[in-house]
Regions:
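Phosphate/ribose-phosphate-bearing ligand recognition and processing surfaces
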Residues: 79-167
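Glycine-/small-residue-enriched capping loops at alpha/beta junctions
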Residues: 1-88, 92-104
Length: 167
């Protein structure tokens, strides 16, 4: 599977599946989830929350509505209770779950944000390392392209350096 890193707004990406950085309730609030919710139009938040709550590390799939994708895979790296903080295990499990869901749907391309960072509180560089390690180790059936995405210039530079070490 080709593994690249890109910079930009995940809601503007084109792929078979876009991964949402979700909490266990699957409610689409701010950050990556907010960007996807606003760009998708339609009842994506309602569809997502109807599939939750899910266990930490699990993923659920919705339609992508107006996004340039077929599906949004909502990967729960953050609990919506307690301290609401992501962990190494939750980031790894959510990344694997997202890739497996996209693969099971027959997707060939997927865009994955650095799960567990931002409002979920995990340090970006370490989170990027965990996500990149899981993407690099994944043995796909249908997926042929995975892009890990960062929004800001500084996060992209960090992601690029991490991916170069991991690949």
């Amino acid at each position: 599977m080709e593994f690249t890193v890109v910079q930009g707004d995940i809601a503007a990406e084109s792929a078979d599946a876009l991964v949402n950085a979700a909490g266990t309730s699957l409610r689409m609030g701010s950050g990556v989830a907010g960007a996807l919710r606003r760009a998708a139009g339609g009842p994506i938040n309602e569809e997502a929350t109807s599939k939750g709550p899910v266990d930490l590390g699990e993923a659920a799939v919705t339609d992508a509505y107006e996004l340039d994708a077929d599906y949004v895979v909502h990967a729960a790296a953050m609990p919506h209770h307690g301290d609401r903080q992501a962990t190494e295990a939750s980031i790894r499990e959510a990344t694997r779950s997202a890739l497996a869901e996209a693969d099971a749907l027959g997707c060939e391309s997927v865009v994955v944000p650095v799960l567990g960072t931002g409002v979920a509180g995990f340090e970006f560089e370490t989170g990027a390392e965990l996500v990149c390690e899981e993407v690099a180790a994944y043995d796909p059936e249908s997926l042929s392209e995975a892009r890990v995405i960062a929004y800001s210039d500084s996060e992209y530079r960090t992601l690029e350096a991490v991916a170069d070490r991991v690949r």
